[in-house]
Amino acid sequence: MSVSTHHHHVVLFPFMSKGHIIPLLQFGRLLLRHHRKEPTITVTVFTTPKNQPFISDFLSDTPEIKVISLPFPENITGIPPGVENTEKLPSMSLFVPFTRATKLLQPFFEETLKTLPKVSFMVSDGFLWWTSESAAKFNIPRFVSYGMNSYSAAVSISVFKHELFTEPESKSDTEPVTVPDFPWIKVKKCDFDHGTTEPEESGAALELSMDQIKSTTTSHGFLVNSFYELESAFVDYNNNSGDKPKSWCVGPLCLTDPPKQGSAKPAWIHWLDQKREEGRPVLYVAFGTQAEISNKQLMELAFGLEDSKVNFLWVTRKDVEEIIGEGFNDRIRESGMIVRDWVDQWEILSHESVKGFLSHCGWNSAQESICVGVPLLAWPMMAEQPLNAKMVVEEIKVGVRVETEDGSVKGFVTREELSGKIKELMEGETGKTARKNVKEYSKMAKAALVEGTGSSWKNLDMILKELCKSRDSNGASE
């Protein structure tokens, strides 16, 4: 059923990081799918020149989505020339100045908005806080997207509302504390990313966070890449506590990707096919594009994988044998494959031989694993990943947690810990329970986006009816 007979225009502006770009592009696909019977929506994506090739390639199946590049600012202190996304930053310590620099896009963004058809609503990343100012100038309702789930948001809100960790000396970084609004959940101070340790940089990070919070509270709502059935108590908490903008679950957005066409199989798929034929389950190992793992820790991971005797496919940008020394590749030749190229993670997780995923628990990766029914071995490293891991392991029980020696998030993980937890996930009773649970959540995930009846589909319906009708009544152009 069509929301309106008028033609509507939606603007998407993702942050310059693949983990943030992809979900918003998938949301653009979902918008068009929602209106495929009677195309009454157009979608425009804003980005910068160095990010446009990736976006255009990702959307090659969806030429209806228009992509506009804005010139990325030059001569930013500490940022190498030509760096336009966080994956290319020499260090994540440059994240705050990089994010601050995006505000220099604002005048170009607003000049371009003047030339476009009337915008029905905008979805922009929370790190692009300044887009709320642009939205207000043009009287455009703005939704904010942070790329996190409702669980992490709700727990964070409760912790900061009750000021659990405001006094530096009040709790050690690793002392468990009960979350007042969720008494079954215990968190540690180190579960919350405090930015950097340098005072000036911490101050800059705090200032950026305050700007984000201010812009978020003036937004029309949150778009959450999740589904209600996965975390209903936390969605309800977020929508019932105070005057914050309403959050809307519209995922899992990874399920909007089109089926792969018959292109040539890469070597890693041939290897997985072989393992399937041999009846050998495979552990997929990947930590995203921004995890900073020391060579010492990488060596320990390699030895832990080797000791576990489990078959594994490990995707890493580093030359493992160069770090560990000659002989490692020969020793794991039958059981392991190391890939240093870009891979299609969804295709790997969907492969019948893959029975576990050792992950940093970035939300995109965790949710993909849930959607295909693969349990997780959670090893969080930064940002809200510790909360994602807590949700995966303790709340919905679809995974096992890797523990550091000192109990902190960024502490060292031994080969014995890794080997033991790998075997527990792949062969143990906890792994069997996680595998059973994740299969059930996988079914729920697919049901959430069923046309007409899914919870996320209905949420999108409500958003479009509310915003598009209200823009019609205010004289929005067709």
From Swiss-Prot:
Annotated positions binding UDP-alpha-D-glucose: 289, 343-345, 360-368, 382-385
What's the EC number here?
2.4.1.-
A Pfam family cross-referenced in the UniProt record is UDPGT
Q: Which of UniProt's keywords are assigned here?
A: Glycosyltransferase, Transferase
Keyword Chaperone attributed:
no
Query: Which branch of life, at top level?
Result: Eukaryota
Matching InterPro entries, A to Z? Tudor, UDP_glucos_trans, UDP_glycos_trans_CS
Among SUPFAM superfamilies, the record links this protein to: UDP-Glycosyltransferase/glycogen phosphorylase (SSF53756)
MF-aspect GO terms: glucosyltransferase activity; UDP-glycosyltransferase activity
Cited PANTHER family: GLYCOSYLTRANSFERASE, UDP-GLYCOSYLTRANSFERASE 90A1
- Family statement: Belongs to the UDP-glycosyltransferase family.
Q: What is this protein called?
A: UDP-glycosyltransferase 90A1
Gene that encodes it: UGT90A1
